[in-house]
């Protein structure tokens, strides 16, 4: 009895399905036109600072300070992808290199989120004080803080002397970032000012070429010693 019921129900279903298929075939399917993306949304650092109008005054550093559109990021964090190969850090966004420089010394080692907050706060302070794009101020500070000439030790026949040498563009950027971060860290030690405020002051003074900047003073000292060892 149950088998007869199953067979009859299957026959009824087989008669209904073709009828439904015919009804569906008559329906007109409307599709939405595909939307074309005419232009990509602009990527701004921290959602505020654009990088399309940044200019680098020193032509020798244009390939080593990455601030163009293809290096734009919302946050200065790339999970170390530029550390896999030698000299690839030249393509690392310059703000991320500045953020990583703040993580030096034991007390700040590995605290990337804290360093990002410091840079974000410092950029807001720079914008309030100068009414300029903080990215442009940072680039100007790095260009002005990198020493063009340094001295090295040369030994011959047991005598050691110092010889003036030219500094490569990548090392100029490396030393500029290190001097700026060191100056901000030392200024904030045992001071009522926060690290973000000291970093903003250091970047503004370095961008102006002022002697109040730790990086500018150290750069002038290195170049003066190198000049005496020519």
UniProtKB/Swiss-Prot annotation:
Residues 1-22 are annotated as: Disordered. CDD domains: uS7_Eukaryote. InterPro entries: Ribosomal_uS7, Ribosomal_uS7_CS, Ribosomal_uS7_dom, Ribosomal_uS7_dom_sf, Ribosomal_uS7_euk/arc. One of its GO terms (biological process) is ribosomal small subunit assembly. SUPFAM superfamilies: Ribosomal protein S7. Pfam families: Ribosomal_S7. One of its GO terms (cellular component) is cytosolic small ribosomal subunit. The keyword Ribonucleoprotein applies. One of its GO terms (molecular function) is rRNA binding. PANTHER family: RIBOSOMAL PROTEIN S7. Belongs to the universal ribosomal protein uS7 family. This is Small ribosomal subunit protein uS7B. It comes from Drosophila melanogaster (Fruit fly).
């Amino acid at each position: 009895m149950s088998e007869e019921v199953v067979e009859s129900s299957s026959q009824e279903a087989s008669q209904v399905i073709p009828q439904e298929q015919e009804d569906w075939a008559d329906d007109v399917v409307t599709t939405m036109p595909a939307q074309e993306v005419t232009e990509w949304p602009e990527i701004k650092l921290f959602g505020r600072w654009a990088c399309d109008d940044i200019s680098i005054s020193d032509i020798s550093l244009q390939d080593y300070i990455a601030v163009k559109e293809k290096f734009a990021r919302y946050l200065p964090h790339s999970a170390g992808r530029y550390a896999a190969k030698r000299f690839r850090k030249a393509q690392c966004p310059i703000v991320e290199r500045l953020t990583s420089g703040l993580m030096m010394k034991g007390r700040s080692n590995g605290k990337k989120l804290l360093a990002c907050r410091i840079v974000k706060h410092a950029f807001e302070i720079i914008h309030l004080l100068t009414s300029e794009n903080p990215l442009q101020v940072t680039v100007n500070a790095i260009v002005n803080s990198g020493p063009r000439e340094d001295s090295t030790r040369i030994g011959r026949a047991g005598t050691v002397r110092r010889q003036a040498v030219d500094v490569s563009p990548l090392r100029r950027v490396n030393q500029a970032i290190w001097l700026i971060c060191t100056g901000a860290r030392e200024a904030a030690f045992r001071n009522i000012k926060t690290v973000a405020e000291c970093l903003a002051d250091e970047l503004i003074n370095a961008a102006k070429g002022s002697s109040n900047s730790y990086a500018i003073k150290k750069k002038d000292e290195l170049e003066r010693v190198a000049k005496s060892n020519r």
